[in-house]
Amino acid sequence: MYDWDEITGNSSNSIGYVNFVDEKHEFVSTHYIVNGIPVVKVSLSKSADDTLEWLYEYLYKLYKEPLYSSESEVQAQYGKLFTDIDKSETPQYIWRTDRSCIALIHWYDSDEDITKYYIKAEPIK
């Protein structure tokens, strides 16, 4: 979706992508810079009951098994691999490619009781 060198600032809008394979699940992405590091978030345009499972299967089809999947491993590695850390985020899985670290995130706002799942990616440090 992105080449890291192309992200030089914060996006002012989200970008939507039609999923021709599964029209029920359309993507939305946004990008921004944190301490000079580009960050991309990809989510489904409409949350569904199967969002976590669907995003996992999507990433699995692209990258196979996650590098980190046990809760303790994921938590420990997330802080080492990612620059943009939000206290409301709980990483579920982490994949690593030649150029990127990719996490499947559970985000929860306890004040509003809102849960979201999304993919977050950053270039390898």
Residue ranges and their predicted role:
Residues 1-125:
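A cross-family detector of function-defining hotspots
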